[in-house]
Design a protein with these regions (language model features):
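N-terminal beta1-alpha1 ligand-phosphate binding loop
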Residues: 6-24, 296
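Glycine-rich phosphate-binding loops at beta-strand->alpha-helix junctions
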Residues: 102, 286-308
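Phosphate-binding/catalytic loop of phosphoryl-transfer enzymes
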Residues: 2-9, 106-111, 122, 126-205, ...
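Phosphate/ATP-binding catalytic cores across multiple sugar-kinase/actin-like superfamilies
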Residues: 73-81, 260-285
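Short beta-strand-loop/turn "lid" adjacent to the catalytic site in phosphate-handling enzymes
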Residues: 56-117
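Non-transmembrane, aqueous-exposed alpha-helical and coiled segments at domain scale
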Residues: 89, 259, 263-267, 278-282, ...
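Glycine-rich phosphate-binding/hydrolytic loop that grips phosphoryl groups
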Residues: 11, 15, 269, 319-366
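Conserved ATP-utilizing enzyme core subdomain
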Residues: 2, 17-31, 36-41, 183-272, ...
């Protein structure tokens, strides 16, 4: 059997742009991640997506127009990746596209990711798989997180308990014991509140290198208020999003006289503390924690995590396991597309709470 190429496209809750990753599979077996491409969202597109997080007027029309806009951007990302690798559409077995989450409401049985999969298939000429969360939700799952099955397939070790931590807008953890089922859940905010505060105060998309946080100090009263959220006492499986952790929620916990840098420093430690608390509660004895996602580029956050987890758990980038930390989530959706094409169940039901394994996604033929 010849190796096959798949492309995964991911737009996370940070809403900064679209990542595309090209992977190589041998039938059902992972071989390697080959290449990555990224296209940023314009400020206008990001703002339009953010407004759809809240109930507003004419949502159906606005969401469908944005789904088409996103699909055209996704197609450009694919075409850019193909050109860089001297490949054509006929070289790709399938695309796996997550879309852009605008609402996640598992308690009501739905999760909405904006993308027009038929348009994406038409524009690229490549068979396209998407709508991965709906089938898990249909069998009483949370529809999230979906990446623990991918983490298990690539990173599980027969001799030690590992964990994989993705720090995107939301943080999620996959626990990979050597001799029992893997599981995972959303620990809470990742970069989401930090980014929202940065945009609100300094009109910048994120705190580059944690520079603003490094100028501040942790505010104990604010930290205690933020930690006093019912999400953290809920048992897993569980998942969350902007619906619970928004800028307005944060502002409701401020007195108004805090230094902006102190708020930022507190938000960084808050993310680290909630990750640590959730991980230790779920799996007290983790030997190695592998980190991916945009949060790995914040040295203040990584320092806080290393301080909290030391000396029992060693922290590493997923690069140590031969996968770039910025590529992991998009690679996961390429892998999910390969699972669909090979009829392999791929929902991590121990993580989502679904009552059984299911093949995730729906397929759309290219032109």
């Amino acid at each position: 059997m010849q190796p096959q190429y798949y492309i995964g496209i991911m737009s996370g809750t940070s809403m900064d742009g679209a990542d595309a990753v090209l992977i190589q599979m041998q039938g059902k077996q992972w071989q390697r991640a080959v290449a990555h491409s990224f296209l940023p969202y314009s400020d206008g597109l990001r703002q339009e997506l953010l407004t759809l997080q809240d109930i507003g007027e004419n949502e159906l029309h606005r969401s469908n127009i944005l789904a088409q806009t996103l699909s055209r951007l996704y197609a450009q990302t694919v075409q850019q990746l193909l050109a860089e690798q001297n490949l054509s559409a006929k070289d790709i077995a399938a695309i796996g596209c997550h879309g852009q989450t605008i609402r996640h409401a598992p308690e009501h049985g739905y999760s909405i990711q904006l993308v027009n999969l038929s348009l994406l298939a038409e524009l690229t000429g490549i068979f396209t798989v998407g709508d991965f969360r709906s089938r898990d939700l249909a069998c009483n799952g949370q529809g999230a997180p979906l990446v623990p099955a991918f983490h298990e397939a690539l990173f599980r070790d027969a001799n030690e308990t590992r964990a994989v931590l993705n720090i995107g807008g939301i943080s999620n953890i996959s626990i990979l014991p050597p001799d029992s089922p893997s599981f995972g859940f959303d620990t809470g905010p990742g970069n989401m509140l930090m980014d929202a505060w940065m945009q609100h105060i300094w009109q910048q998309p994120y705190d580059k290198n944690g520079e603003k946080a490094a100028q501040g100090k942790v505010l104990p009263d604010l930290l205690a208020s933020l930690l006093d959220h019912p999400y953290f006492s809920r048992p897993y499986p569980k998942s969350t999003g902007r619906e619970l952790f928004s800028l307005s929620w944060l502002q409701g916990r401020l007195k108004g006289d805090e230094k902006p840098e102190d708020v930022m420093r507190t938000l960084v430690f808050y993310t680290a503390q909630t990750i640590f608390d959730a991980t230790k509660q779920a799996a007290p004895a983790i030997h190695h924690l592998y980190i991916c996602g945009g949060g790995i580029r914040n040295p203040v956050l990584i320092h806080d995590l290393e301080t909290l987890f030391s000396p029992d758990t060693k922290l590493h980038s997923t690069a140590k396991l031969h996968l770039d930390p910025q590529w992991v989530e998009a690679a996961a959706f390429a892998w999910l597309a390969a699972c669909w094409c090979n009829q392999v169940p791929s929902n991590p039901h121990h993580a989502t709470g679904a009552h059984s394994h299911r093949i995730l996604g729906s397929g759309h033929y290219g032109n």
